[in-house]
């Protein structure tokens, strides 16, 4: 039996947050998918999610996550207003699936990201 960094009840929160982050970064902020993946995996947030830090797994929205990742990695404030989006884009589902895969496999986002390039 594999021991995960956080309990299964938080997986849906992490999936929704990362799905929303991918969707917002790519479709609203117009950050390329490759660039966002690179920023995410080098940010402290990828490791904090991997470790199950409650503030990251259940305490942030995807939009907040993108703003903090961009500030941490690029030292730049995003001045883009968030939009209410009730549809689920392809980018959303990519982030959603990656969050689950990371939790299930216990691989780091950096390791998963290396397979991407």
Outline where the language-model segments fall.
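Thiolate-centered catalytic microenvironments shared by cysteine-dependent enzyme domains
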Residues: 110-113
């Amino acid at each position: 039996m594999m021991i995960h960094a956080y309990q299964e009840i938080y997986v849906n929160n992490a999936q929704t947050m990362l799905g929303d982050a991918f969707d917002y970064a790519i479709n609203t902020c117009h950050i390329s998918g490759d660039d966002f993946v690179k920023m995410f995996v080098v940010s402290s947030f990828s490791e904090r999610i991997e470790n199950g830090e409650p503030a990251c797994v259940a305490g942030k929205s995807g939009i907040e996550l993108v703003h903090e990742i961009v500030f941490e990695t690029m030292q730049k404030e995003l001045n883009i207003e968030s939009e209410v989006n009730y549809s689920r884009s392809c980018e959303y589902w990519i982030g959603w699936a990656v969050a689950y895969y990371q939790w299930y496999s216990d691989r780091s986002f950096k390791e998963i990201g290396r397979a991407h390039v």
